[in-house]
UniProtKB/Swiss-Prot annotation:
It comes from Aeromonas salmonicida (strain A449). This is Protein-L-isoaspartate O-methyltransferase. It is found in: Cytoplasm. CDD domains: AdoMet_MTases (cd02440). The gene is pcm. Disulfide bonds: none annotated.
Amino acid sequence: MIVQRLLNQLIAQDIRDFRVLAAIAKVPRQLFVDEAMAHKAWDNTALPIGNGQTISQPYMVARMTELLIQNDPAHVLEIGTGSGYQTAVLAHLVEHVYTVERIKSLQFQARRRLRQLDLHNVSAKHGNGWLGWPNKGPFDAILVTAAASEVPTALTDQLADGGRLVLPVGDSHQTLQLIERAGSQLTSRILEPVRFVPLIDGDVE
């Protein structure tokens, strides 16, 4: 079975959290890619979704999600809705997902897909992801699906005590980072090299 093949690949890549694997199995990735790419939907690779954006490789979705949910977050902020695939995976794992997308056409399509899957524990906003969603915070966890040139202060400010921020950071050389808040203190860990589209700061489209 094509889904099981992907799950086996993720397990071989050291994805161990059964909750993450179950969520990925539940989300039909073919709904989140262009019809012409549907035959590649369950491949462990990133795919273009238009507007210069991509749907992330399932391994990276699983890796970031696994890091994010270790503190069992209830309310999660996602920066960069994109196709809505990562949003859908999160929606199977947490109480509520707040997601921000700066490209209106992508946000519209993502909302349609999430409704189609009866995922109603998602609030979506068209806006500048660098700013987060301050009036809905603080958040137990924040996930960023595009690479910031530096860690946005607005996002660390919206992180609850005990919360986790998972994001790619860098321009030409990017690393996946995990930032944790304990009271007023932030600790940061660099995890692995990655490659993401850039997180744009500025006017929405």
